[in-house]
Amino acid sequence: MVSSTPEMLQGGLTREQIVPSRKRIKLPAWLEIAKPRLIPLLLATTLGGMALSEGWPLPSLRLACTLGGGALAAAAAGVLNCIWEQDLDGRMQRTSGRALPSGRLSPTAAFIGAISCTLAAAALLVSGVNCLAAGLSLLGLCSYVLLYTAILKPRTPQNIVIGGVAGAIPPLVGAAAASGHVGLSGWWLFALVMLWTPAHFWALALLLRDDYRAVGIPMLPVVKGPVVTVRAISRYGWATVLLSGFGVWALPEGGLLYGLLLIPFNARLLQMVHQLGAAPENVDRAKGLFRWSIFYMFGICLLLVVSRLPMAANFDLQAWSLLQQMASSGQFI
């Protein structure tokens, strides 16, 4: 018999306080399995990839097709993930109420929905964008379902390090949509998302390690414990901050404004990483870092878009001109 009393986790918080409750956020079964909460950030990094390209801004129709196709591909990946993990979800208290393990939706209906979304995404991207963007979107879908979900997640604590490639593909899609190819700037944002992902996900895994342990999923906090996990979070957090600075050169214009606006984002990220390092078992700090890491990546993508505005280019020209005047007059000496 399952107790109706909320389970208490580390720090005296209930699971419902750590992870949003499905009872509070009611979604239709067909929408729930598409994991809509994950899609906005994927689309934001797609926009970031576009903003890094010479083809920015995109025509309205191509922009809409790129984002629509990306959302459909992400939804299909989410559904296929739920189908693959329905037995696992049924054994975890946090996920047992999801549409498939609870019986609110049949696997057949879910699979039909996933295939429909995949075909619609491919059609929209091929017809409204280009074949490269379509191919990269499908590669991201397959990477998430096959590489991460089926192969890496149940086998290695480094699953999210390697499997993070799936979440890092949207910037490549954006770059391909904007210019028809993926340049070095697109690969820079791909690498940044790859480095950001482990720290982001391990902060959440610290909160849910009891669930993962119960079903035998070898997440890093389960295998190595919170202290080692927090050290790894610190390494990836610092790597993310260092690589993020290269956006100054990755942007075709507006890089100086990006660099200045980036400083508070990186300072806050490092502060939260340091705070968690001082108390690896602290639930509030892990939860705070997880939430901030989401805001951080949204912020990076917003900065990339803002830095492509005409006023950002003007700011760069005036700033560099001022710096050159100061250098020539010896004011730096």
Curated annotation (Swiss-Prot):
Pathway stated in the Swiss-Prot or TrEMBL entry: Porphyrin-containing compound metabolism; heme O biosynthesis; heme O from protoheme: step 1/1
EC number: 2.5.1.141
PANTHER family, sorted: 4-HYDROXYBENZOATE SOLANESYLTRANSFERASE, PROTOHEME IX FARNESYLTRANSFERASE, MITOCHONDRIAL
GO biological process, one term: heme O biosynthetic process
Keywords tagged on the record: Cell inner membrane, Cell membrane, Heme biosynthesis, Membrane, Transferase, Transmembrane, Transmembrane helix
GO molecular function, one term: protoheme IX farnesyltransferase activity
Membrane-protein topology: Multi-pass membrane protein
Membrane spanning stretches: 63-83, 109-129, 132-152, 160-180, 188-208, 245-265, 292-312
Descriptive protein name: Protoheme IX farnesyltransferase
Domain of life assignment: Bacteria
A GO cellular-component term linked to this record: plasma membrane
Family (UniProt): Belongs to the UbiA prenyltransferase family. Protoheme IX farnesyltransferase subfamily.
Further remarks about this protein from its record: Carbon 2 of the heme B porphyrin ring is defined according to the Fischer nomenclature.
UniProt organism field: Prochlorococcus marinus (strain MIT 9303)
Reactions it catalyzes: heme b + (2E,6E)-farnesyl diphosphate + H2O = Fe(II)-heme o + diphosphate
Known role: Converts heme B (protoheme IX) to heme O by substitution of the vinyl group on carbon 2 of heme B porphyrin ring with a hydroxyethyl farnesyl side group.
